[in-house]
Amino acid sequence: MSSAQMDPHDKMRSRDISKVARGQQAPRPAHTPGTVSPPPENEATFRAKRGDSGRETDAAVEERFPVTNETRHCFNRFMQYHKCIEKNGRDANDCNNLRDYVRSICPEELVSKIWLKSGRNKESQGHYQRQYED
């Protein structure tokens, strides 16, 4: 007797091989890489991610990382503000509310950095970078 322990999965594999050798079981097909497709997303998973309304929601607040949460929410609202400007124009009341919200929630250094460097210069040319999407 051997004192080495066998993994139960190895035992099953050895049994399968012996059955195949005796002709009692067909061999398993070889695995071809890249043939595994992701599982289909069910309705419950979709609703959990997007909410009942079907719109995507922000991730839950992580209390361990308050600065990260603040920065992420600041940037998301900043992007919503620019989407509002593209859709409704600069003078829309909803856009002004978002602008005020961005200015109140975001640190002044961050607002000036993303607003002036990435927003105003590239916005006049019709494009700007979007690193994080809602």
Curated annotation (Swiss-Prot):
Q: Where is the composition biased (Basic and acidic residues)?
A: 7-19, 44-61
For this chain the motif Cx10C motif maps to 95-106
Pfam families referenced in this protein's UniProt entry, alphabetically: COX6B
Keyword ATP-binding present in the record's keywords: the answer is no
InterPro entries per the record? COX6B-like, CX6/COA6-like_sf, Cyt_c_oxidase_su6B
Q: Where is this motif: Cx9C motif?
A: 74-84
Report the coiled-coil segments: none
Where does this one sit in the cell? Mitochondrion
Q: List the disulfide bonds.
A: 74-106, 84-95
Q: Which SUPFAM superfamilies match?
A: Cytochrome c oxidase subunit h
List the residue ranges of the region (Disordered). Answer: 1-61
Alphabetical UniProt keywords: Disulfide bond, Mitochondrion
Please give the superkingdom of this protein's source.
Answer: Eukaryota
Question: What GO CC annotations are associated with the protein?
Answer: mitochondrion; respiratory chain complex IV
Q: What is this protein called?
A: Putative cytochrome c oxidase subunit 6b-like
UniProt source species: Arabidopsis thaliana
